[in-house]
Amino acid sequence: MHFDRMKINVESMKQAILERVYCGVVQTPQSASTRDIFTAVAKTVSEWMAKGWLKTQSSYYDNDVKRVYYISMEFLLGRSLKSNLLNLGLLDLVNEALSDLGYDFDQLVEMEHDAGLGNGGLGRLAACFLDSMATLGIPAYGYGLRYDYGIFDQQIENGYQVESPDEWLRYGNPWEICRGEYLYPVHFYGKVKHSMDSRGRDVAELVDSQEVLAMAYDVPVPGFNNDTVNSLRLWQAQSRHGFEFSYFNHGNYIRAIEDIALASNITRVLYPNDSISEGQELRLKQEYFLVSATIQDILRRYTKTHLSLDKLSEKVSVQLNDTHPALGIAEMMHILVDREELDWDVAWDTTTKIFNYTNHTILPEALERWSLDLFSKVLPRHLEIIYEINARWLKKVSQKYPGDDDKRRALSIIEEGSSKFINMANLAVIGTSKVNGVSSFHSQLIKNTLFKDFVEFFPDKFINVTNGITPRRWLALSNKRLSALLNRSIGTDYLTNLTHLNKVISLAEDSGFREEWHKIKIQNKEDLSARIYKELGVSVNPQSIFDCHIKRIHEYKRQLMNILRVIYFYNEIRNGSTEIVPTTVIFGGKAAPGYAMAKLIIKLINNVAHIVNNDPKAKDLLKVVFWPNYRVSLAEAIIPATDLSEQISTAGMEASGTGNMKFALNGALTIGTMDGANIEMAEHIGKEHMFIFGLLEEEISALRNEYYPQGICNANPKIQEILDMVLQARLPEEDKDLFKPIVNRLLNEGDPFFVLADLESYLDAHNRVARLFTQPEEWTKKSIYNVGGIGFFSSDRSITDYASNIWNVSQSS
């Protein structure tokens, strides 16, 4: 880093922190609150990073490097203090300095709110990638939105999810810097006026539009143990007009701030509820706001050192993290053609060389389609551009497949019918250089299904880059005990080359090493047990299986199947079974505000937890916990204490998953389907060290048209009994039909996620889990094998693949 570590000692660290207490938060050590001290430490760390940050950015200009721009609606960063200190190499030093000053470092860490910039795996992947790009010295920038209230805070009231604003910015964000000099206009609505210029060229001008300003906020991203500090730039929406003083003076106080409110709504929350038309419109505005400000900024940075746009595609590579930023393709064409007056073909060639697209799903509801009516209202010029892109594209399609209207329909950006839609995934494929899936299985699946027709046209465009995770946060930070054991046993090289973890496999036969390993897991479980009791009031047994299912609540992730399994084992306990192995089942995750079935599943989990946890028969055998407001910092506490990782999505529906990797990295065993990255994990770790169950994707595809879930119940009385108990899981004062929609979903609506089809196999897999857990030596061996085999799944390896195979950029570390 830019500072000399040899000159920093505990005393100089103490002085630096105290100086920030006096001059930064304007307190004395005696009057400062814990939050004041946290802010002082964070500001001290920021100052240490500042010179390195400036040096990094200057070097990018001086060397005229090709830059990578990673655009994402989400960056699920978690907390930054410990992560930044670890990467700077100052974690232990700061801890010691604070201890000398009489402050508890762990208490300070708790003062930091998780950054409200993401929700699920998409955002956490983006955060891991930022860490790896900086660690590898890649000239990269993240671009996202600065949400005032994040996704939402989740409370549980009477078993139901209740959403409230995530006030993550209430006390400010000590890591961000407002860049007021970077303020870009973004235009919505209006109408397009066409005219002819002196050269006979058509000129399009958007008139009568609504203008909103994009204000830049920068967050530093330090690499691990190197001199790189990259930037995450976040945009906040602001009104062009601001406070309307004349309205205020006439008593119209609402109108005086109306423009401010309407503009600010764009970056108010992540993913506004799109089950209503207003929410759909706001989402579209969010996505365009992000790409418009970002592309204006990219071009500003490029033109700072280049007089023409001739080398734009040689100096810029843009990665679209899912379809949310795919509008960037149309925006780049808008700027190059309308403002820079490039010839269409030149602009299109440049654009398609710059952009690349990561697909994260094949689920129809997650593949964005915008109604033509909405799109034409909000972005009229961009609709014209997309029509032109599509017309030229379909001309090529017709040349390759003359007279094949089915092929034209399949490959068109515009979906025809009684209602017309713009297919953003198709735009993303047509307008990019490379399209990648995020696991080998998923990449093959999108080539065989979703983008099959495109693969025929662009056989070399589709590649795979399997997802990964950063071992710095997910092992060194979150599991200090295990990382300390690894450091003593195999060295620290695994922190930057995770494949070095394979050295631990040879130690699996060492009984002394296994004993240490097992002891660490128990200590982590004891810590988590204490926290569960403190925060949730549930007493759990740290000697039980800690069985964790923590991720976004969605039917395809099958939390429902898990709670049906819990009901089955609870029934076994009530019937006097003596073969139940004590188990603590931990759920966590948020449901989208408009997703009624997911929210009802949360209610079912909480009702079952209430019933089970209050039954004396189950006291020592089964506990169920739903941990509200699942977030990165909570995952960092749960994952190191987990014995069993639930990765049970319907085969073919989870693109990759990264939670599976985090659990395995911390020594948990996986129970899962052959889906997403589970398949590659089985190859690297060994299928024998996992609990694989369920139908394969091809079996589900074959079964889909003739699947009859009622027949499963008819043939299997214990499954029918489970469903009967679901209906009885209501509490005394609740509607007797409360959970009827869940049973209807399974029996009368075709069980679209094949819960009942896989349930028997899932129960059998859990029986295998229970048998192995009663053999702690064997369980611990498999735990070690999981850690030893997970080395491929580093985000450093993922980013190296992107850099080599997609971006064509070099790394300096």
From Swiss-Prot:
<keyword id="KW-0021">Allosteric enzyme</keyword>
<keyword id="KW-0119">Carbohydrate metabolism</keyword>
<dbReference type="Pfam" id="PF00343">
    <property type="entry name" value="Phosphorylase"/>
</dbReference>
<dbReference type="GO" id="GO:0030170">
    <property type="term" value="F:pyridoxal phosphate binding"/>
</dbReference>
<keyword id="KW-0808">Transferase</keyword>
<keyword id="KW-0328">Glycosyltransferase</keyword>
<dbReference type="GO" id="GO:0005737">
    <property type="term" value="C:cytoplasm"/>
</dbReference>
<dbReference type="InterPro" id="IPR011833">
    <property type="entry name" value="Glycg_phsphrylas"/>
</dbReference>
<dbReference type="InterPro" id="IPR035090">
    <property type="entry name" value="Pyridoxal_P_attach_site"/>
</dbReference>
<feature type="modified residue" description="N6-(pyridoxal phosphate)lysine">
    <location>
        <position position="662"/>
    </location>
</feature>
<dbReference type="InterPro" id="IPR000811">
    <property type="entry name" value="Glyco_trans_35"/>
</dbReference>
<dbReference type="GO" id="GO:0008184">
    <property type="term" value="F:glycogen phosphorylase activity"/>
</dbReference>
<comment type="similarity">
    <text>Belongs to the glycogen phosphorylase family.</text>
</comment>
<protein>
    <recommendedName>
        <fullName>Glycogen phosphorylase</fullName>
        <ecNumber>2.4.1.1</ecNumber>
    </recommendedName>
</protein>
<keyword id="KW-0321">Glycogen metabolism</keyword>
<comment type="function">
    <text>Phosphorylase is an important allosteric enzyme in carbohydrate metabolism. Enzymes from different sources differ in their regulatory mechanisms and in their natural substrates. However, all known phosphorylases share catalytic and structural properties.</text>
</comment>
<keyword id="KW-0663">Pyridoxal phosphate</keyword>
<dbReference type="GO" id="GO:0005980">
    <property type="term" value="P:glycogen catabolic process"/>
</dbReference>
